[in-house]
């Protein structure tokens, strides 16, 4: 992967670019004028990343920015990855772990609307109130999400799906998301050990359900790298081999129908369980591709 130039995999399908120092107007114009879904990877690392490592590699904690307005997860590690002049106003949380959720960071970038699972809504309200008071910033509107109930957020249709993950709150239902716009159906899945049956059914990718509908794009966590398929974290996270297996099944059952040449993007990669970006670029099985901090991808419909 050329990390400093446009990556053209299919003229009609996908555009990816490395965007260190990107101008806000470029990002905004692409998001507003496109009939696709623009994703900027703010961070692609798992919880064990903390700055540049001994190899010179650096991944911030996992977070994405959708169409310049909507964040999915956000922590202080990603504050420097928001393009200058871009002002996200909304955040969607997958769960309450500290490598995904930080109320102070959300308030500092100007978030006014927060969406998260109703199973920890009261906790989040309390913590956001404390953060808002500490920073002397306005309290955002916090909306509880319910599994399977789609909501409209900044021109996106977002459907919460149950994840296979656990937090310190045994009653919390962690989430992954189906994100839809202009024919794009993106599965954003982190943190989760595979795709739970209920999530597959709701998203339309369970082959048992003949009325299902294919997804067209995938961003999936790969906490564990190649050779770590039997890692102890496999109940709550997914390996590279696990993602590849999921993709094969979805392709075989025709429940994943991407534009020609479009990769499946990996995120949430553990520092101790993966090689360098260059090693991942050359060593991952097709169609998997390791995302990196600052990567932008324009997903388009088939």
List each model region and its residues.
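Active-site metal-binding loops of divalent metal-dependent hydrolases
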Residues: 44-46, 69, 75-76, 96, ...
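Metallo-beta-lactamase
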Residues: 26-36, 119-175, 180-182, 288-297
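Structural beta-sheet core signal
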Residues: 91, 187-188, 266
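N-terminal export signals
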Residues: 5-26
